[in-house]
């Protein structure tokens, strides 16, 4: 069996199936277990805690890496890059911010994989600026739906992605270009297991990692909002609740003004100030 140190570093060459099985054997952490481990790492520099955190999240890296299989790169390499992002996330994670590690780590995992794809998908880089990178990853999804673009479709894509039609044409041209020696020769991968079909299949049956990320982010946002509301005075808190959080009815400024014996304009001012305070508290 692959030991902990091996599974942390790189995907075992030619044995990706075994790696995935082992990664999935590691139990997922409860909230309390995760908090204890992240605090041990952050405040005591406990490397054993870091190792456990990384091992218990490898399954998420595997899942995320499958979403990038369409670029013709080995899944083992994508996983390796994702693992680097996971390690960076574990090192930077603050257990006091109130979100689960997986929510924080998704950004770092995707960021490392993005960089790897951009470095290796073409010998000549196709995306060097921030806007080009956004277009690169989104254009592949759009092209699966539309195929080759005509002028009208270029305009549609440009509007959808918030870029110019010129950028769309240029990126489509770059992505359609052929590179010399893009695919490695068979001699470079003598072991047939290295090119097993699992490395090129995208898992479309679930969206587990994104689902966990979304659920935890929504929980984090709700907790931040509740905490921010408690910082408001009682009247401001009631105004915000009545205007924005009451699902049963929409309270008008005048209705609230009548309850407090003030003008509707004064309620509007209080609401505006309260919203500013909430925004600052939530973004803090």
UniProtKB/Swiss-Prot annotation:
Coiled coil: none
Gene3D superfamilies per the UniProt record, alphabetical: 1.20.120.1810, 1.20.140.160
Taxonomy, superkingdom: Bacteria
Region (Sigma-70 factor domain-4): 228-280
Main location class: cytoplasm
InterPro entries with a match to the protein in the record: RNA_pol_sigma-70_dom, RNA_pol_sigma70, RNA_pol_sigma70_r2, RNA_pol_sigma70_r4, RNA_pol_sigma_r2, RNA_pol_sigma_r3/r4-like, RNA_pol_sigma_RpoH_proteobac, Sigma-70_Factor
DNA-binding region: 253-272
GO molecular function: DNA binding; sigma factor activity
Keywords: Cytoplasm, DNA-binding, Sigma factor, Stress response, Transcription, Transcription regulation
Cellular component annotations (GO), alphabetically ordered: cytoplasm
Motif (Interaction with polymerase core subunit RpoC): 77-80
GO biological process: DNA-templated transcription initiation; response to heat
SUPFAM superfamilies for this protein: Sigma2 domain of RNA polymerase sigma factors (SSF88946), Sigma3 and sigma4 domains of RNA polymerase sigma factors (SSF88659)
Cellular location(s): Cytoplasm
Region (Sigma-70 factor domain-2): 53-122
PROSITE patterns xref list: SIGMA70_1 (PS00715), SIGMA70_2 (PS00716)
Keyword Transferase: no
Family: Belongs to the sigma-70 factor family. RpoH subfamily.
PANTHER family in the cross-refs: RNA POLYMERASE SIGMA FACTOR RPOH (PTHR30376:SF3), SIGMA FACTOR RPOH HEAT SHOCK RELATED (PTHR30376)
Subunit and partners: Interacts with the RNA polymerase core enzyme.
Function: Sigma factors are initiation factors that promote the attachment of RNA polymerase to specific initiation sites and are then released. This sigma factor is involved in regulation of expression of heat shock genes.
Name of the protein this chain belongs to: RNA polymerase sigma factor RpoH
């Amino acid at each position: 069996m692959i030991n902990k140190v091996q599974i942390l570093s790189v995907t075992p060459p030619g044995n990706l199936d075994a790696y995935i099985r082992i990664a999935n054997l590691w139990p997922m952490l409860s909230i309390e277990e995760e908090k204890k481990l992240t605090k041990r790492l952050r405040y005591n520099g406990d490397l054993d805690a870091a190792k456990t955190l990384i091992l218990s999240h490898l399954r998420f890296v595997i899942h995320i890496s499958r979403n990038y299989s369409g670029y013709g790169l080995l899944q083992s390499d994508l996983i390796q890059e994702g693992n680097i992002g996971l390690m960076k996330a574990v090192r930077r994670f603050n257990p006091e911010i109130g979100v689960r590690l997986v929510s924080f780590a998704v950004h770092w995992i995707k960021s490392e994989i993005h960089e790897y794809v951009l470095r290796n998908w073409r010998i000549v880089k196709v995306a060097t600026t921030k806007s080009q990178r956004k277009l690169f990853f989104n254009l592949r999804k759009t092209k699966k739906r539309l195929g080759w673009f005509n002028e009208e479709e270029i305009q549609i894509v440009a509007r959808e992605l918030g870029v110019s039609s010129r950028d769309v044409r240029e990126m489509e041209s770059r992505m359609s270009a052929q590179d010399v020696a893009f695919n490695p020769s068979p001699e470079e991968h003598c072991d047939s297991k290295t090119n097993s079909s699992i490395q090129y299949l995208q898992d479309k049956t679930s969206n587990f990692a994104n689902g966990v990320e979304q659920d935890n982010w929504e929980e984090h946002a709700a907790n931040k909002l509740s905490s921010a509301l408690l910082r408001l005075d009682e009247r401001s808190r009631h105004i915000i609740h009545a205007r924005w959080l009451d699902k049963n009815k929409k309270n008008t400024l005048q209705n609230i003004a009548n309850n407090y014996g003030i003008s509707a304009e004064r309620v509007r001012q209080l609401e505006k100030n309260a919203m500013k305070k909430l925004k600052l508290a939530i973004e803090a």
